[in-house]
Amino acid sequence: MEDLKVTPLRGVYEEYGGKIVDFAGYELPTQFKGFLHEHHTVREKAGLFDVSHMGEVMVTGKDAGKFIQYLMTNDINILKDNEVLYTFMCNEDGGVIDDLLVYKFAENEFFLVINASNKDKDVKWIMDHKGDFDVEIVDESDSIAQLALQGPLAEEILQKIVDIDLQEIKFFKLKRDVLVNGKKCLVSRTGYTGEDGFEIYCKPEDAKGLWHAILNAGKEEGVQPIGLGARDTLRFEASLLLYGNEMDETITPLEVGMGFFVKLKVEEDFIGKDALIKQKAEGVTRKLVGFELLDKGIPRHGYEVIKDGKVIGHVTTGYKSPTLNKAIGLALVEEQYSKIGTEFNIKVRKKELKAVAIDKRFYTKKTKTK
């Protein structure tokens, strides 16, 4: 795998049986003991992920809050210090440049966590729109490693090696300078699995030690390292969207049912606001729906959705759900076919298989300490 980047944890994958693939230009483990085993481990116990390939950008300065609001669809004004917000960053047409997390450290200090596959594009977009805003933008991606501990036992495990009461960190809140196994880290109660859990940001040189410390701390509870395969099935079951599948620069947040994160009534302008106001007024012409395959087969990304011989959309993500044990998927279809109960076909390997539209919230589990 020449010319691929590596994370600070690259050296530990084989130690745990990791199978390496190219993901977003990085050598990353697709699985360790098998993605089904790993999926159930996170749902029932806890799993540890290397997510150091994600990007991190610091935005500071007198106009930091105004600048972030100009870039984002969500209402940045509601963020208090040490809180986290999920948002979209859109182009002028309302298409999604990226979906990301905004961490507010202080009034003029924000930390953006961006998707690995969009790092270069996002940083350029942010820099290109700096204009007259009095801000400093620093790409911190290469100087930060990130681990995610996810699952119902995550708090119990992590509590053993931190110097604070983790109950202090509520859902979508953060704490800086937490000592994790003696190393200073940023810890947030966030994740991409539909389970309770934490994301831990540390110095690259501390990542291996923390990886081993967390796995050792959770031995009794059955914690396991988790690869990209289970990461995708977990997020999919929880209806957490994946950039490049459910959204891209030609798809808007409104089309994928994420209008809650688009605050069109905020006083300030943001990039794409006018286009999204227009789209909301006129109504979307396509929608993201959940579906269940009624015939035997597995739907995959890109498969056509067909109604009465006409292509009405495409599958964005599809799997045989490990938790629900049935073939389900997400599809972007013409609006008139998006109602729950609507029947259509999915073209799987030249065969049209019957499917029915269902609620896309396939799996929900209340996150602790809301």
From Swiss-Prot:
GO terms for molecular function: aminomethyltransferase activity; transaminase activity. Its EC number is 2.1.2.10. Gene3D superfamilies: Aminomethyltransferase beta-barrel domains, Aminomethyltransferase fragment, Probable tRNA modification gtpase trme, domain 1. One of its GO terms (cellular component) is cytosol. The keyword Transferase applies. The glycine cleavage system catalyzes the degradation of glycine. It catalyses: N(6)-[(R)-S(8)-aminomethyldihydrolipoyl]-L-lysyl-[protein] + (6S)-5,6,7,8-tetrahydrofolate = N(6)-[(R)-dihydrolipoyl]-L-lysyl-[protein] + (6R)-5,10-methylene-5,6,7,8-tetrahydrofolate + NH4(+). Belongs to the GcvT family. One of its GO terms (biological process) is glycine decarboxylation via glycine cleavage system. It comes from Clostridium botulinum (strain Okra / Type B1). The keyword Transferase applies. It holds the Pfam family GCV_T. InterPro entries: GCS_T (IPR006223), GCS_T_bac (IPR022903), GCST_C (IPR013977), GCV_T_N (IPR006222), GcvT/YgfZ/DmdA (IPR028896), GcvT/YgfZ_C (IPR029043), TrmE/GcvT_dom1 (IPR027266). It comes from the Bacteria. Keywords: Aminotransferase, Transferase. The glycine cleavage system is composed of four proteins: P, T, L and H. This is Aminomethyltransferase.
